[in-house]
Curated annotation (Swiss-Prot):
Family as reported in the entry's similarity comment: Belongs to the class-II pyridoxal-phosphate-dependent aminotransferase family. BioF subfamily.
Organism: Nostoc sp. (strain PCC 7120 / SAG 25.82 / UTEX 2576)
Keyword vocabulary terms for this entry: Biotin biosynthesis, Pyridoxal phosphate, Transferase
GO biological process: biotin biosynthetic process
Binding residues for substrate: R22, H134, T356
Protein name, as recorded: Putative 8-amino-7-oxononanoate synthase
Binding-site residues for pyridoxal 5'-phosphate, renumbered to this chain: G109, Y110, S182, D207, E208, A209, H210, T238, L239, S240, K241
Superkingdom of the organism of origin: Bacteria
Pfam family of the protein (one): Aminotran_1_2
Record note on quaternary structure: Homodimer.
MF GO annotations: 8-amino-7-oxononanoate synthase activity; pyridoxal phosphate binding
Positions where N6-(pyridoxal phosphate)lysine occurs in the chain: K241
PANTHER family membership: 8-AMINO-7-OXONONANOATE SYNTHASE, CLASS II AMINOTRANSFERASE/8-AMINO-7-OXONONANOATE SYNTHASE
Needed co-factor(s): pyridoxal 5'-phosphate
Length: 386
């Protein structure tokens, strides 16, 4: 009989030949702007720790205190033995920050997207999704069983055409978009999307994963940045990027959150977020709101790097309005080579390749804790490669 697992080796060979193969690299020590990777100290431009809070002593102290009081795990589903007062405090803090009625915390942002989408739509419904949306939005759409149609990246006119042609054929319609697109750094046209959602009686779900803590006057995200606070929509985000912890959230109306508590499978049938992660996220939200200097320093770094990168000839810098700056390369092999050369020079900014993105690139993420000297070294190395 043939080996039923033999195809795995052939698939891996195909991945290798396409220069799509991926493997993990262990970071040693605490998260920060400078880390040790494979025994080499490198400047870290690969992290989503935008405010530099993952190594903040206050988050660590909050996590330790919660572990000492409540133990290491939540021990069960939130609907059974896994709910702690800390979870409720975190949900209230998120809802207050976002100026919504209620919030629900999941064990990850990925689970928040999959669970919310699966609960909101089904076989009789339509999903319209930006083609560059995160994998969690795309997979959530597929798993929901709804009819899924993509529209070209940020093309509101094309989305409207699809709504005109198809909306009347379905019970419900859910529009899905990232607010900050994680592999490009650009922003969705949120006010226009909200206008279309209202015009065609659609739900709008916006993933604020890379905007939470970063965008808007108080760091509440792109909804705040665009002046759309208070308008009817579904906001999803993560606690694992600018907030330096782990977990995801959904925030919106009381009815929405109450419904998800009863219908979102990835919340109902999984263990609640650990006390340590919950307490760390709660501490991070307080810091993000009370200490705007972290966000101000982040944006100072973003603007400084963008200004310097624009002076490098032939660097194909992609449009961005966030701490994510990318420059495009011709092929996966070139991206891998540039990423390797950067690492040899003490810069950690790995290659991003298909199928994650349509075109290969180097993705640079800024942090509030980057120093001017870090940014200047990155630019000097890129100039040398160019």
């Amino acid at each position: 009989m043939p080996d039923p697992y033999a195809w795995l080796q052939n698939s891996l060979l195909t991945i290798h030949r396409a220069d799509w193969y991926r493997s993990v690299q262990a970071i040693q020590g605490r998260a920060g702007a400078s880390v040790v990777l494979g025994g080499q100290e490198v400047i870290n431009f690969a992290s989503n720790d935008y405010l530099g809070l993952a190594g903040d002593e206050r988050l660590i102290a909050a996590a330790v205190a919660a572990t000492q009081e409540f133990g290491t795990g939540s021990t069960g589903s939130r609907l059974l033995s896994g709910h702690r007062e800390l979870h409720g405090q975190l949900e209230k803090a998120i809802a207050s920050w976002k100026q919504t009625e209620d919030a629900l915390v999941f064990s990850s942002g990925y689970l928040a997207n999959i669970g919310a989408i699966a609960a909101l739509v089904g076989k009789r419904d339509l999903i319209l999704s930006d083609q560059y949306n995160h994998s969690s939005l795309k997979n959530g759409a597929i798993l929901s069983g709804a009819t899924v149609r993509e529209y070209s990246h940020c093309q509101v006119g094309e989305l409207k055409t699809q709504l005109l042609e198809q909306r009347q054929n379905y019970r419900r319609c859910l529009i899905l978009t990232d607010s900050v697109f994680s592999m490009d750094g650009d922003l969705c046209p949120l006010p226009d999307l909200l206008d279309l959602a209202e015009e065609f009686s659609c739900m709008l779900l916006v993933d604020e994963a890379h905007a939470t803590g970063v965008m808007g006057e108080t760091g509440a995200g792109c909804v705040e940045h665009f002046g759309c606070t208070g308008r009817q929509l579904i906001q999803i985000g993560t606690l694992s990027k600018a907030l330096g912890s782990l977990g995801g959230y959904v925030t919106g109306s009381h009815n929405l959150i109450d419904y998800l508590r009863n219908r979102a499978p990835s919340w109902i049938y999984t263990t609640g977020l650990s006390p340590a992660d919950t307490a760390a996220a709660l501490a991070a939200i307080n810091i993000a709101q009370q200490e705007p200097q972290h966000r101000m320093q982040l944006w100072h770094n973003v603007n400084y790097l963008r200004e310097l990168l624009q002076k490098i000839p032939n660097l194909k810098l992609l449009p961005s309005a966030s701490p994510i700056l990318c420059f495009q390369l011709s092929s996966p092999s070139e991206a891998l080579q540039v990423g390797k050369q950067l690492k040899q020079a003490g810069i950690f900014a790995p290659a991003i390749r298909p199928p994650t993105v349509p075109t290969s690139r180097i993705r640079i993420s800024l942090m509030a804790t980057h120093k001017a000297s870090h940014i200047e070294k990155l630019v000097a190395v890129l100039q040398g490669l160019n």
